[in-house]
Amino acid sequence: MSALPIATNRYFDNHFERPGVKLLPNEFYTTAEDMVLMTVLGSCVAACLHDPYAGIGGMNHFMLPDDGADPGAAASESMRYGAYAMEVLINELIKAGGRRERFEAKVFGGAAVLAGMTTINIGDRNADFVRRYLALERIRITAEDLQGVHPRKVAFMPHSGRAMVKKLRLQVPGVTEREAALAREADRLRAARTRAQVELFAAKRPAAPQPARPRIELFGGRGTTPGAGSQAAGSPYAANLSRKQEA
């Protein structure tokens, strides 16, 4: 499993009049600075964690890969990836002086923005995961804006814990295309894993035993070794064959 990268797209936000960082899918960022963390979500989810006592916070942005397993199965690959994305954020905040028992969470995203996804709603899957994970970790959710059909623009102030969300129109240039690409990549990886499992299964199957060749006895042969289709020179049977061929 590759490391979750730290967001590096820093800029100055004129609206909030402070430095900012834009997060892309599968990135995270933590800080104690008075700045704004910004991201745009479709079916992906973002968890914003804040320690009000230490004045630090952070955000992640991720989508669970669809590995074909039960979404609630703790051992599935998608659940392991989601847990990893959350653990990276939590551990980085703890390293910076935060305390897990003081963390408060605000969660966003999980919209149904990908048309044609009839077998599973990726947004619902992501929203369900982040709720259950935080409940298991006993991190209180103080605000949420999850699911629905609209993409969202989220702004989070990690120093104060303040979060704002703006619903976007259904078709936002770049958002649907980006998440469709993520879904296609997840499907490709899933298909590759399935092929690898089939090949591994085939390689492990024991080879079928070869049937024993029937022994053929020679009629009237002396001092000969039985063999399939072999005729001993000088045997009566060989002589009979010669006479039939001459006739």
UniProtKB/Swiss-Prot annotation:
Q: Give the matching InterPro entries.
A: CheD-like_sf (IPR038592), Chemorcpt_Glu_NH3ase_CheD (IPR005659), Cytotoxic_necrot_fac-like_cat (IPR011324)
- A GO BP term, please? chemotaxis
Disordered: where is this region?
204-247
The record describes the protein's role as: Probably deamidates glutamine residues to glutamate on methyl-accepting chemotaxis receptors (MCPs), playing an important role in chemotaxis.
NCBIfam families linked: PRK13487.1, PRK13489.1
What broad class of enzyme is this?
hydrolase
What GO molecular functions are on record for this protein? protein-glutamine glutaminase activity
Keywords, alphabetical: Chemotaxis, Hydrolase
Does Hydrolase show up as a keyword for this record?
yes
Q: What's the Enzyme Commission number for this chain?
A: 3.5.1.44
| Name of the protein in its database record | Probable chemoreceptor glutamine deamidase CheD
Q: Which HAMAP family match?
A: CheD (MF_01440)
SUPFAM superfamilies, alphabetized: CNF1/YfiH-like putative cysteine hydrolases
Xref: CDD domains: CheD
The taxonomy runs: Bacteria, Pseudomonadati, Pseudomonadota, Betaproteobacteria, Burkholderiales
By sequence similarity, the record places it as follows:
Belongs to the CheD family.
UniProt keyword Ribonucleoprotein, yes or no: no
The protein's annotated catalytic reaction(s) are:
L-glutaminyl-[protein] + H2O = L-glutamyl-[protein] + NH4(+)
